[in-house]
């Protein structure tokens, strides 16, 4: 599309709010932003819809599945779901099949994303077998390495990753749980007891100690913290930390009954008390980012007995609007923007997120009219514990100057996403 214009009711530039504003887009950049209407008919006119344009939303934690797990989700369906939810960039996790623990598997995943992604993307690698593989994978344009609880038993491999990440200037991301502290039945109302909060905080301390032992100082990020103590421990150690919408807004009592596997997720949903404290820490500014942990499965898998059903549920079609409807008033627009856009971009190292003259034309437009969560038909995961709950919706998604989605046309065709580390900022 040549130079074109989008107009909205409200536009947040990254430091101030404008009303009845238009952005003139030329190529992949915002040429100028102005208020007071537009002479003629804008190419994309979203006024009169309670529309709010923000610098593009980033999701630091998604599972697009793909490869041999494409029956759950794939790179096309997952990124289409992201576009429909106003997410402009996703960071894909490595626990697919084969797991992204070798350069060969990582190349296959990157090729699949290049062929099908409808939003921009980056990837985390798993913990490889050797330091040499870690160095090679760190040079392949990844966002960082992901450490899972089962990886923590091999500290030599962890130290290899810490060293390689520091050398390459990329992230080390930790799933904060320690398996050796799990106890009891791992399903239903007992999950938060079986996977206790102190297992989260202990894993953060363990990773900090491993980094100290090897003399490494990589950038460490703690993802999907479900407990207040995990957030506090992370900040104490100088790590960044994110939380998920489900840990902020759902409690075990609401959706994780003894026969209900739709709400089964790792780390588990907590009680009302932990959830309230986690929300308070978020409001107070201790949480750096919101990330979805979009973790799709087939419907038949989630109808299995809760003891064996896989953990996780889909979020990409809805989480920005769902979160904005519940949190934006409490934290303010500036803080909300920081947690879903600017700070994730800084942590991932993918360039600034702003919306004024000269900024990248990557824009999320939320519609601030309450609706209810429904299946939009993009993700392959046709279940969610938040079905029917109130939410804002996505009006439009623009990625590097191209319209990826509008609420009335849906997701546009073609693979338009690129590896975020290759975007010129």
From Swiss-Prot:
CDD domains, per database record: DHOase_IIb (cd01318)
GO biological process, one term: purine nucleobase catabolic process
PROSITE patterns documented for this protein: DIHYDROOROTASE_2
Residues bound to Zn(2+) 2: 146, 175, 224
One function term, GO molecular function aspect: zinc ion binding
PTM-bearing positions, type N6-carboxylysine: 146
Coiled-coil annotated spans: none
Pathway membership: Pyrimidine metabolism; UMP biosynthesis via de novo pathway; (S)-dihydroorotate from bicarbonate: step 3/3
Protein residues bound to substrate: 63-65, 95, 297, 311-312
Protein name: Dihydroorotase
UniProt organism field: Aeropyrum pernix (strain ATCC 700893 / DSM 11879 / JCM 9820 / NBRC 100138 / K1)
């Amino acid at each position: 599309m040549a130079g074109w214009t989008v107009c909205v009711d409200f536009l947040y530039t990254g430091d101030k709010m404008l009303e009845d504003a238009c952005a003139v887009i030329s190529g992949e950049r915002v040429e100028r932003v102005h208020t007071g209407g537009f002479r003629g008919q804008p190419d994309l006119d979203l006024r009169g819809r309670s529309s709010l344009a923000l610098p593009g939303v980033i999701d630091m934690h998604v599972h697009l599945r793909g490869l041999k797990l494409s029956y759950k989700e794939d790179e096309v369906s997952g990124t289409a779901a992201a576009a429909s939810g106003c997410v402009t960039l996703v960071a894909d996790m490595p626990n697919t099949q084969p797991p992204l623990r070798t350069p060969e598997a990582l190349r296959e995943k990157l090729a699949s994303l290049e062929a099908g992604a409808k939003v921009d993307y980056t990837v985390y690698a798993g913990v490889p077998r050797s330091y040499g593989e870690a160095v090679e994978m760190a040079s392949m344009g990844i966002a960082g390495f992901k450490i899972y609880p089962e990886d923590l038993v091999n500290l030599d491999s962890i130290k290899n990753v810490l060293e390689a990440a520091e050398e390459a200037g990329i992230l080390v991301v930790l799933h904060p749980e320690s398996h050796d502290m799990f106890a009891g039945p791992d399903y239903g109302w007992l999950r938060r007891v079986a996977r206790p909060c102190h297992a989260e905080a202990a894993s953060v301390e363990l990773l900090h100690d491993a980094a100290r032992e090897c003399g490494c100082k990589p950038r460490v990020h703690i993802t999907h913290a479900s407990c207040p103590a995990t957030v506090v421990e992370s900040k104490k150690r100088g790590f960044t930390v994110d939380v998920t919408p489900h840990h902020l807004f759902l409690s075990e009592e609401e959706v994780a009954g003894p026969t209900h596997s739709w709400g089964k997720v790792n780390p588990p949903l907590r009680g009302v008390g932990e959830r309230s404290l986690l929300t308070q820490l978020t409001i107070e500014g201790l949480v750096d980012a919101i990330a979805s942990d979009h973790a799709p499965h087939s419907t038949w898998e989630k109808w299995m007995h809760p003891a064996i059903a896989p953990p996780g549920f889909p979020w990409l079609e809805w989480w920005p609007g769902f979160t904005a409807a519940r949190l934006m008033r409490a934290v303010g627009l500036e803080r909300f923007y920081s947690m879903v856009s600017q700070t994730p971009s800084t942590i991932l190292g993918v360039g600034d997120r702003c919306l004024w003259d000269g900024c990248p034309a990557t824009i999320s437009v939320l519609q601030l009219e309450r609706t209810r969560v429904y299946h939009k038909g993009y993700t392959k995961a046709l279940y969610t514990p938040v079905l029917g709950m109130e939410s804002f919706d996505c009006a439009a998604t623009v990625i590097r100057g191209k319209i990826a989605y509008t609420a009335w046309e849906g997701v546009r065709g073609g693979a338009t996403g690129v590896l975020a580390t290759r975007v010129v900022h």
